[in-house]
């Protein structure tokens, strides 16, 4: 379900591309240092958005540098680090673990079990460090699994379940920005879930998998789906624009106002081609 909240790369300036890559590399670097290199398999640009948002809001001091790694061994890549990069790395590991565990328990995917077993030793520390967020992830995964087994025909229920998860992830601490971050996260989570349901409609139909639009007996309706998405993103943007963001604002705007739509339409085009 992750992988949609990313930038439209072609629309970024060279400086924005460099910054975006440095944040991503910083998260990757922290995942390796704080857990295991295997955890980098779960690395997602969605968490780069989370880090960028919190960094723009709280403006922390940053450590930066350049370093080559196994994935990029020829040319050193720039990276940045701060407490929000580390937070995004922790959330990436936690989400990766519970997602893999769910894939193993529900679908019997052996690769998912292997990765979950590798990440499991790091969960107690994450639960101690971020009890609210880890509790929200567990609750969301459990809730979504239950709704899928019930073949829930109401898209609002699973969308709101995922919205609660994103609300908790965006709220780094309980402060004056927590309300706006939480409501932004809730709407963003609903957007992601509904986007994923629309993007995977044809694939889920072919494979007989749960999809709320299929469960409610809905035929493919691109126009209606996009109306749902515009509404959810509109509510997300309303809260987003209340935040006093300056640093990386253009990059964040690109992700929310362009990147998510480019990714959605690309996925729908791909699925329609596979269905045809």
Which residue ranges define each predicted feature?
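Acidic catalytic motifs of isoprenoid enzymes
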Residues: 1-183, 190, 194-230, 238-248, ...
């Amino acid at each position: 379900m992750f992988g949609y909240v990313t930038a439209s790369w072609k629309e970024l300036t060279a400086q924005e591309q460099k910054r975006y890559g440095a944040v991503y590399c910083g998260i990757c670097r922290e995942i390796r240092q704080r857990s295991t290199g295997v955890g980098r398999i779960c690395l997602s640009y969605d968490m780069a958005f989370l880090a960028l948002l919190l960094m723009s809001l709280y403006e922390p001091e940053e450590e930066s540098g350049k370093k080559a790694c196994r994935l990029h061994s020829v040319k050193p890549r720039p990276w940045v680090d701060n407490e929000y990069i580390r937070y995004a790395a922790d959330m990436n590991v936690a989400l990766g673990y519970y997602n893999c565990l769910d894939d193993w328990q529900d679908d019997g995917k052996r690769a998912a079990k292997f990765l979950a077993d590798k990440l499991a030793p790091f969960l107690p520390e994450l639960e101690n460090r971020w009890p609210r967020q880890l509790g929200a992830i567990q609750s969301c995964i459990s809730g979504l699994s239950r709704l899928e087994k019930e073949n829930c025909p109401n898209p609002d229920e699973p969308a709101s379940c995922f919205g609660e998860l994103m609300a908790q992830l965006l709220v780094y601490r309980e402060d004056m920005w927590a309300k706006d971050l939480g409501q932004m996260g809730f709407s963003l989570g609903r957007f992601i879930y509904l986007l994923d349901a629309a993007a995977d409609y044809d694939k889920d139909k072919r494979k007989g998998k749960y999809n709320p639009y299929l469960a409610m007996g809905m035929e493919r309706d691109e126009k209606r789906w996009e109306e749902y998405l515009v509404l959810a993103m509109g509510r997300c943007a309303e809260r987003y624009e209340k935040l006093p963001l300056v640093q990386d604002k253009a990059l964040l705007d690109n992700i929310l106002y362009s990147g998510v739509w480019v990714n959605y339409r690309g996925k729908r085009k791909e699925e329609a081609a596979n269905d045809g």
